[in-house]
Amino acid sequence: MLTPERIKTLSKKVNFVKALSAVIPAYQTNVESLHYDVFEDEETGYDYEYLVIDYVGGAHSYRSCNGNSISVIFEEIAGMLDSGYYEEERDYNVVKSSCRKIKF
């Protein structure tokens, strides 16, 4: 179960990624959208954090960011923009289909 403190921390991460999304120029990066998804497994209470980049043309890149600090998330975004992480798509889709998405 997400505690109020945990929700506050996750909200900061979501808002950080939203703010970065607003300043990443699509014409130079081909990034259509950048977002931070949080899911909760209602059975175990465990939460999953994913950084998601949707590219112009339909490609997607996913990165698990469970427990990462904001500075590490920033580094992950840089890595995703440079080369991407496609191997975590299956994990993301399993979590997305089996867990409740937390809305901020």
Segments predicted by a language model, with ranges:
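Short acidic DE-rich linear segments
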Residues: 99-104
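Acidic, low-complexity, intrinsically disordered interaction modules
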Residues: 26-97
